[in-house]
Amino acid sequence: VSQDNNIQLSVDKLLGSTCGVTLIKRGNYALEPTVRGLNAGQINTTIDGMQMFGACTDRMDPISSYVESNNLSSINLNLGPNDEQFGSSIGGGFNFKLIKPQLGAKKFVSGSLGAGYETNGNAYRGLAMVQLSKNKWAIQANSIYRKSNNYLSGKNREVLFSQYEKWNFGVSGIVQLFKNNTLSVDYLQDNGSNIGY
């Protein structure tokens, strides 16, 4: 994931363009990623190496829905059954690596703003990121808000209860304690409301 080029894309769109990954669409919100046809308990899904489990038993909100592209520095995909670093599973898995602030950046204050609109579902989104950076410490905050009405099917029929609204907020800080030692803290919150399936 390149932060500059893909910050406007959803995680679903980033995963959908990855070889070996297909997405299961059950509604307008949160497509479920599969690795070579395997999903759920057959694949490992982690955020910064931390094992995650979906809250919904029918997989309507997969782990990939808890992060946004502006939270991420990269998405690591393992296509095989071995992954010593984040745990093994029969189908491989994903590790969503959170973006970290940069110590000693060229500018003390930097950031970005973005907005997007999709005609189907009258969907819009807005995002922001700000970073403060010194040689010994840095902090970064990012947020995104997305809202969509019911979308239209291929035959131009309204799919009822396919609306959603969500916001996502992340903050990360890092302090250099010694020459080769740093302390970092991450916070990520994702809230969805009025989500129809």
Regions found by a protein language model. Name each.
Residues 40, 134-137, 178-180:
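Outer-membrane beta-barrel channels and translocator barrels
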Residues 31, 90-92, 109-111, 124-128, ...:
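Hydrophobic, lipid-facing positions within transmembrane beta-strands of outer-membrane proteins
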Residues 160-162, 180-197:
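Flexible loop and strand-edge segments within Gram-negative outer membrane beta-barrel domains
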Residues 113-117, 132, 141-147, 185-189:
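Transmembrane beta-barrel strands of outer-membrane/channel proteins
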Residues 67-112:
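A beta-strand signature from Gram-negative outer-membrane beta-barrel systems
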Residues 12-51:
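Extracytoplasmic beta-strand/coil segments of soluble accessory domains associated
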Residues 116-124, 148-175:
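Outer-membrane beta-barrel proteins
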Residues 22-23, 51-81:
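Short acidic/polar hinge/loop motifs at secondary-structure boundaries
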